[in-house]
Regions:
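Rossmann-like AdoMet
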Residues: 1-85, 89-132, 145-146
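Short amphipathic alpha-helix with an adjacent loop that forms part of the alpha/beta core around
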Residues: 138-147
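A conserved beta-strand element that flanks and buttresses the S-adenosyl-L-methionine
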Residues: 152-153
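A short, conserved alpha-helix within the catalytic core of class I
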Residues: 160-173
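Conserved beta-strand signature within the Rossmann-like core of class I S-adenosyl-L-methionine
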Residues: 176-189
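Short, glycine-/aromatic-enriched active-site segment of Class I SAM-dependent methyltransferases
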Residues: 189-205
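Short alpha-helix
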Residues: 204-234
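Core SAM-dependent methyltransferase catalytic element
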Residues: 240-266
């Protein structure tokens, strides 16, 4: 029996991205494998018709998944016993794809998002759920932390916030963890201004913030230094071969979302 899911605004995007991953997984030559997403979509009583038609959103989600999965896996191979903090997790299932490669994994999100996650995913260790905002200092009190290396993932969130909110999130991270790396997805100001996702039309979710590159982000987040910057063009290359050509065009790379890797100053 399917369970009815009522979501509005930003939390609605978590259902849309889940569907995108499930849709790709079901393809014959799928570029990702997210069987949990497939099973969750089967259980959800939700109208996915808009998401089904929003190819731009689907390609973006899959490209991001390809790139971030690769980056997170490489990081965890180099850093044993890492504590992972996944901010604005929604219905993300990366913790299962990376199973056995981390010490503890904390999925953090707002109450309305976590209410839905808890309906379908029981996480009691080494994956845990924290029902709080990433701008609430107290969420770190729920993390079992003893000076271990920490990896923070911020995916699909910053474009819905403002600069004050971004600074608050990074300030909490900086104050709370000794050795910490942040992998954060950013959107270009051009896309923020000119693009609207078809799949969330009519919702309260709107793009509100972006930066051109890592240098611009570092000027805002001075306590961290940029270590790496990866365009989602790298993921698009595996979905659409034409991106091996057009991905070399500076304008294309500049307006594509990026994963920026930042480390706290020692």
């Amino acid at each position: 029996m399917k369970e009815k899911v009522n979501v509005t605004g930003v939390p609605e995007t978590m259902v849309q991205t889940l569907y995108a991953r499930a849709k790709e997984t079901r393809k014959k030559n799928a570029q990702i494998n997210d069987e949990i997403a497939v099973e969750l979509v089967k259980k959800l009583d939700y109208d996915f018709s808009k998401a089904d038609k929003d190819n731009a959103m689907t390609y973006g989600v899959i490209a991001r998944t390809i790139v971030l999965d690769r980056m997170v896996e490489q990081y965890l191979k180099k850093h044993a016993n890492t504590v992972v903090v996944n901010i604005a997790c929604g219905l993300d299932t990366r913790c299962y794809r990376m199973e056995g490669k981390y010490l503890r994994w904390y999925n953090v999100d707002l109450p309305e998002a976590m209410k839905i996650r808890k309906q379908f995913l029981t996480e009691t260790g080494p994956v845990y759920q924290i029902t709080k905002s990433a701008m609430d200092d107290s969420y770190v009190d729920d993390i079992d932390y003893h000076g271990e290396n920490v990896l923070v993932i911020i995916e699909g969130l910053t474009m819905y916030l403002n600069e004050k909110g971004i600074k608050k999130i990074f300030s909490i991270i900086e104050k709370s963890f000794q050795e910490v790396t942040v992998m954060v997805e950013t959107m270009s100001p051009f896309v923020v201004k000119h693009v609207k996702e078809k799949s969330i039309e009519g919702s309260n979710a709107k793009f509100t913030w972006g930066v051109k590159n890592g240098k611009e982000l570092q000027r805002i987040i001075s306590e961290f230094s940029v270590q790496q910057e990866v365009s989602l063009v790298e993921g698009m290359k595996e979905l659409m071969p034409i991106y091996h050509v057009i991905g070399k065009i500076p304008t294309v790379r500049n307006i594509s979302n990026k994963i920026i890797v930042m480390e706290k100053h020692g």
